[in-house]
């Protein structure tokens, strides 16, 4: 090559070098105790949103409101069981299209802090772990158990390749990825498990991505939840002393940025307890204290809570089983319906002291409509439609089998046997302690007898004759999502007995109620003749039309007891006005039809009012709690 040609090559190479954009990076700076984004000091102010609790048509509205609140990032959980409902069966369509959600965050200018689990807690069914893991009953979850690790690795090899191109280093907007979740609060304290996850995340995401952990501020939590190679962050709420809480982080991370990965703006609700609320003033003051220290904060667990549609609500275990309500409003800055609250504007004011707010107005609350009263009619008692709900027929077993043993994940299973003798004087139908998981609705000769409940009433008195049919409809109210009892098996875990004599020879019906309803049942079926009685499990149906709009609404259940609601085949979740505090269910406008009837299906479990009506309102009713005995 001659000198002129060589000179041209060198000049072209120099021009190419000058034109190349600088490498994107998001790193820890242990000298200056900060993050560095593309080499410059950086601090994020983030908020949590769970795409699985928000209908896809509302994603943009919620994210835009978060952006306009002054947030620079959102924190996002990925629930494994939402995407792998059965082993090797994956669902990333529609509301489950996590890639579309992440791409929308990027479009709106938000960074992402990703929390892909495999365990997430989040008050979500089984903490995001698939219930099919319990098909191997002796599996040790969240540990180095080879069976558990094999399932985790299989899942991560599907999920993380979708994440890698969206990492900040590769031109995306994901700046950091959490490994596991609050592992220090779990009894196993298995460092080999964390080491395995670290290796898997590095192998699938590369060496540059920032990986971190989150734990509470107690020493034992940080001891078991942290690992060299994972940056340790903490979580705490507005009631904590900020200096002391970050002092706990400094015990395990003497240098590096201060990070609160879950600053609690509110709290969750449990059935039977008062609606939780947290003062806007306290939340804003705590945020300002952290920002003055230069900390990065994820707010806000939650910034927008959303709804536990269908059967996705989890449960806690604190001396007793505590199922979470359908509403996940969380008293968050954005309400369950996505409306800005006083708390949001208090937070926004604090943020404005530390960084400029986006130019423009906050998007308004979504429109709501009170569609009014809708009359329903009884379609059928549940016992009269078992051929529809369990077309494959029952499973025979000498003793009851759990949901997991018959591979039923959510919902309901019916257990049927016969009385072995005449019972002229009331006999005790009872269950061993902790064996009703979670509620059992008892019928004898199709007559409703009452309810058995986990950590509640576990016996009823019955009379009958030899050969009378005894049915127990078992409801899974949500698997435990936090603590040591996460292997939460459902159904009848022990045998029922009659005056201490075990009952045998059961027919077990796994009910596919959602499958039938999504296929148009019962609205597309011929009318069913049914008893006029209102007690016990039964289906009720009705329709209503909207006045040319499909706006969000809230449905109230005057005189109803407990059950499940579907509109147009969409499972809106559990209602339980008798237990409270939640009195209404949120109905997103996106599930409603305009110009044609909206089909309502209700499964009432205990007893409907004599005149079955629903009332559609333009506001929620949260805070009414009656005693546990009601």
What are these regions, as identified by a protein language model?
Residues 2, 149-163, 167-179, 184-186, ...:
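Carbohydrate-binding surfaces of carbohydrate-active enzymes
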Residues 2, 11-73, 109-111:
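N-terminal carbohydrate-binding accessory modules
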Residues 38-40, 77-89, 94, 122-147, ...:
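Aromatic- and acidic-residue-enriched carbohydrate-binding clefts of CAZyme catalytic domains
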Residues 42, 448-450, 572-573:
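Short hydrophobic beta-strand segments in globular cytosolic domains
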Residues 59-127, 198-209:
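Aromatic-lined substrate-binding rim segments of carbohydrate-active enzymes
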Residues 425-446, 470, 544-568, 575-576, ...:
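Aromatic-lined ligand-binding clefts that engage carbohydrates, nucleic acids, or primary amines
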């Amino acid at each position: 090559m001659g000198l002129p040609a060589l000179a041209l090559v060198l000049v072209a190479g120099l021009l190419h070098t000058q034109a190349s954009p600088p490498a994107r990076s998001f790193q820890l700076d242990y000298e200056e105790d900060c993050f560095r984004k593309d080499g410059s000091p950086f601090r994020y102010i983030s908020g949590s949103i769970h795409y699985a609790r928000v209908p896809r048509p509302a994603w943009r509205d919620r994210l835009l409101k978060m952006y306009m609140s002054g947030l620079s990032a959102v924190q996002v959980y990925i629930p494994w069981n939402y995407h792998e409902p059965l082993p090797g069966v994956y669902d990333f369509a529609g509301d489950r299209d996590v890639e579309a959600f992440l791409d929308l965050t990027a479009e709106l200018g938000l960074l992402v802090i990703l929390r892909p689990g495999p365990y997430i807690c989040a008050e979500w069914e089984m903490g995001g772990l698939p219930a099919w893991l319990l098909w191997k009953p002796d599996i040790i979850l969240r540990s180095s158990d080879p069976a558990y690790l094999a399932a985790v690795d299989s899942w991560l090899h599907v999920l993380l390749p979708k994440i890698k191109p969206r990492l900040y280093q590769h031109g995306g907007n994901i700046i950091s990825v959490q490994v596991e979740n609050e592992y220090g609060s779990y009894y196993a304290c298995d460092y080999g498990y964390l080491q395995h996850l670290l290796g898997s995340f590095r192998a699938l995401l590369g060496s540059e991505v920032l990986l971190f952990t989150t734990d509470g501020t107690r020493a034992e939590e940080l001891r078991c939840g942290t690992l060299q190679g994972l940056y340790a962050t903490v979580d705490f709420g507005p009631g904590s002393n900020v200096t002391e809480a970050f002092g706990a982080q400094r015990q395990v991370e003497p240098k590096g940025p201060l990070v609160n990965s879950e600053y609690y703006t509110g709290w969750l609700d449990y059935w039977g307890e008062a609606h939780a609320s947290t003062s806007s003033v306290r939340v804003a003051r705590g945020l300002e204290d952290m920002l003055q220290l230069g900390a990065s904060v994820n707010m806000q667990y939650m910034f927008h809570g959303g709804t536990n549609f269908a059967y996705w609500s989890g449960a806690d275990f604190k001396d007793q089983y505590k199922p979470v309500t359908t509403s996940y409003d969380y008293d968050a800055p954005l309400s369950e319906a996505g409306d800005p609250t006083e708390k949001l504007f208090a937070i926004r004011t604090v943020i404005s002291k530390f960084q400029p707010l986006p130019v423009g107005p906050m998007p308004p609350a979504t429109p709501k409509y009170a569609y009014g009263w809708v009359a329903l009619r009884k379609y059928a008692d549940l016992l009269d439609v078992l051929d529809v709900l369990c077309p494959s027929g029952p499973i025979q077993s000498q003793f009851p089998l759990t949901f997991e043993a018959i591979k039923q994940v959510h919902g309901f299973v019916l257990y049927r046997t016969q009385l072995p003798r005449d019972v002229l004087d009331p006999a005790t139908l009872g269950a061993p302690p902790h064996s009703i998981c979670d509620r059992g609705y008892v019928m004898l000769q199709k007559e409703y007898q009452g309810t058995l409940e986990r950590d509640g009433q576990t016996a009823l008195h019955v009379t009958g004759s030899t050969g009378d049919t005894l049915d127990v409809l078992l409801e899974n109210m949500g698997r435990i999502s936090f603590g040591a009892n996460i292997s939460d098996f459902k159904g009848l875990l022990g045998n029922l007995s009659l005056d201490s004599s075990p009952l045998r020879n059961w027919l077990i019906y796994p009910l596919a109620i959602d499958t039938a309803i999504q296929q148009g049942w019962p609205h597309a079926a011929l009318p069913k003749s049914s008893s006029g009685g209102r007690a016990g499990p039964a289906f009720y149906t009705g329709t209503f039309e909207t006045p040319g709009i499909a706006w969000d609404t809230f449905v109230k259940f005057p005189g109803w007891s407990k059950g499940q609601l579907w509109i147009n085949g969409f499972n809106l979740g559990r209602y339980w006005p008798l237990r409270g505090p939640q009195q209404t269910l949120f109905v997103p406008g996106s599930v409603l039809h305009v110009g044609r009837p909206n089909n309502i299906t209700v499964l009432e479990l205990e007893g409907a009012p004599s005149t079955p009506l629903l009332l559609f309102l333009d506001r929620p009713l949260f805070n009414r709690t009656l005693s546990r005995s009601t």
